[in-house]
Amino acid sequence: MRLLNIFTTLCLLLWSGAATNDGLTDVVEWDPYSLTINGDRVFIYSAEFHYQRMPVPELWLDIFQKFRANGFNTISVYFFWSYHEASKGSFDFETSGKNVQRVLDYAKEAGIYVIARAGPYCNAETSAGGLALWGSDGSMGTLRTNNAAYYQSWQPWIKEIGAILAKNQVTNGGPVILNQVENELQETVHSATNTLVLYMEQLETAFRAAGITVPFSHNEKGQRSQSWSTDYENVGGAVNVYGLDSYPGGLSCTNSNSGFSVVRNYYQWFSNYSYTQPSYFPEFEGGYFTPWGGSFYDECQSELDPSFPDVYYKNNIGQRTTLMSLYMAWGGTNWGHSAAPVVYTSYDYAAPLRETRQIRDKLSQTKLIGLFTRVSTDLLKTDMIGNGTGHSVSSTGIWSWVLRNPDTQAGFTVVQQASSGSRASVTFDVYLNTSLGAVTASDVNLNGRQSKILVTDYNFGNHTLLYASSDILTYGTFDVDVLVFYLEQGQIGQFALKTTSKLTYQVYGNSVFAANSSSTSTSQTFTYTQGAGQTVVQFSDGALVYLLDQPSAWKFWAPPTTSNPQVKPNEQIFVLGPYLVRNASISSGVAQIFGDNDNATTIEVYAGSSLTSIVWNGVSLSATKTKYGSYSASLPGTESRVISLPSLTNWESANSLPEKETSYDDSKWTVCNKTTTLSPIAPLTLPVLFSSDYGFYTGQKIYRGYFDGLTYTSINITCSGGLAFGWSAWLNGVLIGGNTGVATATTTNAVLDLTNFTSVIKSENNLVTVVVDYHGHDETSTAKGVENPRGILGAFLVPKPSASTGFKLWKIQGNAGGSANIDPVRGPMNEGGFYGERVGWHLPSSPSLPSDSTPLIGLNTSGISFYTTNFTLALDSDLDVPLGIKLSAPAGTIARVMFWINGYQYGKYVPHIGPQTVFPIPPGIINNQGSNKLALSLWAMTDAGARLTDVELVSYGVYESGFGFDRDWSYLQPGWDEGRLAYA
């Protein structure tokens, strides 16, 4: 460690001059300490966000405002190629949820930077990792290399998306500050002629040709290789700012004591491989995904615990990290068929901001770190002074990181338990070096999985903290300097102000607060025990100090008065109490505050002496001035607001699998007649039955195969649809088997016994109908990735004829229009091949269905039924009421369910696999005021049939909001037209 410190220190000394840039712009620069934007150092606190997972553009701003309010100044965004190029050469960057410019405009409006991640490969648990699905037929060549076919495939994408990103760079007044090239591409061979090196150089050339001038970045896939850093074996393809992805939690949804072991060698890693660049985490664990058959996110308390950000994110700060992006900050929904097979409909990810857009305690704790780093400019240039167990502390049970700014001598000591997963409460002393000599911060307590950042020589406005043992939340410079600390209730805090005067003070609140006898002629020390709620200390020199317990800190807000992502201490207002403060301004003494609230509370605003009144969401509050200069008022909650959700009744229904009957006319279907394929996976039988070879890339597929003869004893069928998929087969309308699916199988085979169906078999024109479910295309972490075929991989009759499969003809049907993207608003991954989908029964204003059966009655045999109902909502326009659909089925039910709200497929429910049973639906997909259409498909996979026991609208919460969720969403909900009948 000592040799490494010496080496790193020498590097930093050699780098003490001007920051480095990419030679194309000096607006964004970097050095070993931090990123610099427009000449100012900035701590990049970034939130990963995927607009594809929220198809309502207006709600992007809702989410961005919540990010900004909770301390983030940046979003990291994947741009999924698959979402924008449904068929080769046909790009869509403008229609509804695919409007990239609106993403960037809303980011700028919200006051946050953008790190652009346009791939072309992204991973992200999205189908095919974001590669265009038209390449699933094998036509892209060798993926993620400099292969000529692959180059020709991705180049138009980079040209198109690159041009949009280029005009939105910070150099042009936009929000884009970094451009990531590719994604977690491991440089396993450091050779200038290696295909990956050549591929990276191709990509960088293409991005530059598209107009990108901001620095390039990349994300190392964990500490597994050393890739694309100019500081380590740079043979070509290196980026400007190296980054390391890390998901270190090791947490278990079923064992809360599992994992929680922090990584303490990040500092060494960055010192070895990117020592001329700032330490950057393009993806750090904001949560983690759960698979089919796993635990649902709401059940995973270990991942949701606010102690995770408190310990892990401060651990990163202790290792000199100044760029950190949380994956995910908001996960969203894998609506339609957009998910990769490793995940199901919900992509909540146990992220700080829930899929429902609700603030979790985890986000509230994450905010405390964001607001601290926003104003702590001395943190942006620090050297490692030392670290280790028992370092600068009185206990070997404590690990510390000690950092110091070489220019200002401000210090930051991060403490955590040496065994980071410990739940013990430990008290110890910390030995600090200050400008006035060594001091001891006594009685520092860590209550289990907790971390603290102690500061020395910390400037806030015209004041300086000699040291503090409490965590700083933030500070502001108003008429006076206002400092905010937080601790858990009952913990002891200590701080010393540098002053030559003997300060007097007034205490407002119930924390026990006192001056220490150890005060000197140059500093004055104070000790307190944190009480419940907030305490305010007003000093005689004008300084104001808020002492908050953790719940109060979670409801503390510092809305900026500037749209600049870089917020100065004098560009904010302090607000305490509400559930959320979106933004605020002050003019002529009036604080105009917009936000959301749930429970009745007291709102307190500190904005300096000019403040005279408070307006909340346009309503003037009866406010009273406090003795220390803030204003407070009662803020009503929503406890008394009545939310009435209708029961889902008056169902209509129809058969959605007429294709299993021999009388069905398939004359317009696509004939499977190919005997060769570009796929790297060889078909098991011919003709090729891979669905992508016939232009059906997404959703369920239906096959009809014909054979003659009475002598066959079985049919051997192999299908692939992604993890947890299933398939069913009918012979002349009678179920003969299939595979109901298991969570761990992507491909399954079954030998379907025909000996019990002799009465069904005919001498000629026997029909086998096969329905194959689809759970997305694989990411490249799975063998051939997107090129792993979907649908039927092989089928033959037994006994197998010597020169054939026994089948004389196969036909295929998939989503209406195939790759034509006939519903551009909802996009290319919304629909599959069920009859009800093809003819548009899920769309608003579609024709009535002939039966009045309900999904609660269901089917008494195998098959697929389609159900629709309409309902009306009348939620008050000033409310945000996150809604969802709850589904349940009797124990032992073997079935597959999908449902659509106003045409959007927003849930896949597989009761025999799980785990999801409740599905959030955002405003814009559902109309909070007005009519809605719910459609549901029920696929009974056995002759026992299937039914549901519950289809219910549910509410996740009620919030009075200043955002405005009562809008005309009709442009997002195009209705049915007769053209759909062509796909019957």
Swiss-Prot record:
Disulphide-bridged cysteine pairs: 253-300
Residues passing through the membrane, by range: none
Positions of the catalytic residues: 184, 283
UniProt xrefs under SMART domains: BetaGal_dom2 (SM01029)
Subcellular location: Secreted
Main location: secreted
EC number of this enzyme: 3.2.1.23
UniProt signal peptide: 1-19
Chemical reaction(s) catalysed: Hydrolysis of terminal non-reducing beta-D-galactose residues in beta-D-galactosides
One Pfam entry name: BetaGal_dom2
Enzyme class: hydrolase
Glycosylation: residue positions: 272, 387, 433, 462, 516, 583, 599, 673, 716, 756, 860, 870
Keyword RNA-binding annotated: no
Binding site for substrate: 78, 123-125, 183, 247, 349
GO CC, one annotated term: extracellular region
An example molecular function term from Gene Ontology annotations: beta-galactosidase activity
BP GO annotations: galactose catabolic process; polysaccharide catabolic process
Role noted for this protein: Cleaves beta-linked terminal galactosyl residues from gangliosides, glycoproteins, and glycosaminoglycans.
Family the UniProt entry places it in: Belongs to the glycosyl hydrolase 35 family.
PANTHER family per the UniProt record, alphabetical: BETA-GALACTOSIDASE RELATED
Name assigned to this protein: Probable beta-galactosidase C
Protein source organism: Sclerotinia sclerotiorum (strain ATCC 18683 / 1980 / Ss-1) (White mold)
Gene: lacC
